């Protein structure tokens, strides 16, 4: 299984790119949004995180801009009724932050707007996403680094992340305070957020 492919971007369109590495051209399926971002790097070296889907008659690589996005894709396709193409369509429409917000607000209508997802599938997916929100949040934080100084930095960053998801400042402060009490003042924001979300 590949973690990522690093090489020269030799071809690009709205659904896939070709990366040449050591004389081999890898065709990688990706979202239209990511494709647009890559156009500025034609004939340059790029690094794309990949997930392999191997079937009896085909071997498909799906590409992502970050490890976090890749892990979110893997989470999505673990849900019943969500295949790789649908998972990619979801990430094309909703960046990680927005997907977290959709899950918290149980916005079935937003999920149902994704091509290939009907109302019943959207309702079921929403239940799954809501349960996995503590897993999604650290992914949204893009592999957070250790706070620069004290635990106060983690506390403030956590409040900001919760407010981005639609919580009020007062609610976010309460949730983070309870999370710190449960863990410790030295805990990272990635450790605190899943606990904080359970306090909502």
From Swiss-Prot:
Please tell me where this protein is predominantly located: cytoplasm
Q: Which GO terms describe its molecular function?
A: ATP binding; four-way junction DNA binding; four-way junction helicase activity
Gene Ontology CC entries for this record: cytoplasm; Holliday junction helicase complex; Holliday junction resolvase complex
Q: Where is this region: Domain III?
A: 150-200
Q: Enumerate the CDD domains for this protein.
A: UBA_RuvA_C
Q: Where is this region: Flexible linker?
A: 145-149
Give the Gene3D superfamilies listed for this entry. Answer: 5' to 3' exonuclease, C-terminal subdomain, DNA helicase RuvA subunit, C-terminal domain, Nucleic acid-binding proteins
Identify the domain of life: Bacteria
Segments for region (Domain I): 1-65
> Where is the protein situated, by its record's location annotation?
Cytoplasm
Sorted keywords for this record are: Cytoplasm, DNA damage, DNA recombination, DNA repair, DNA-binding
Region listing for Domain II, in residue ranges? 66-144
Q: Name one Pfam family in it.
A: RuvA_N
Q: Which GO BP annotation is one of this protein's?
A: DNA repair
Task: Check the record and name the InterPro entries matching this protein.
Answer: DNA_helicase_Holl-junc_RuvA_I, Hlx-hairpin-Hlx_DNA-bd_motif, NA-bd_OB-fold, RuvA, RuvA_2-like, RuvA_C
What HAMAP family does UniProt report for this protein, alphabetically? DNA_HJ_migration_RuvA
- Function, as annotated: The RuvA-RuvB-RuvC complex processes Holliday junction (HJ) DNA during genetic recombination and DNA repair, while the RuvA-RuvB complex plays an important role in the rescue of blocked DNA replication forks via replication fork reversal (RFR). RuvA specifically binds to HJ cruciform DNA, conferring on it an open structure. The RuvB hexamer acts as an ATP-dependent pump, pulling dsDNA into and through the RuvAB complex. HJ branch migration allows RuvC to scan DNA until it finds its consensus sequence, where it cleaves and resolves the cruciform DNA.
Q: Which family does it belong to?
A: Belongs to the RuvA family.
Let me see what the UniProt entry remarks about domains: Has three domains with a flexible linker between the domains II and III and assumes an 'L' shape. Domain III is highly mobile and contacts RuvB.
Subunit comment? Homotetramer. Forms an RuvA(8)-RuvB(12)-Holliday junction (HJ) complex. HJ DNA is sandwiched between 2 RuvA tetramers; dsDNA enters through RuvA and exits via RuvB. An RuvB hexamer assembles on each DNA strand where it exits the tetramer. Each RuvB hexamer is contacted by two RuvA subunits (via domain III) on 2 adjacent RuvB subunits; this complex drives branch migration. In the full resolvosome a probable DNA-RuvA(4)-RuvB(12)-RuvC(2) complex forms which resolves the HJ.
Q: What is this protein called?
A: Holliday junction branch migration complex subunit RuvA
Q: Which gene encodes it?
A: ruvA
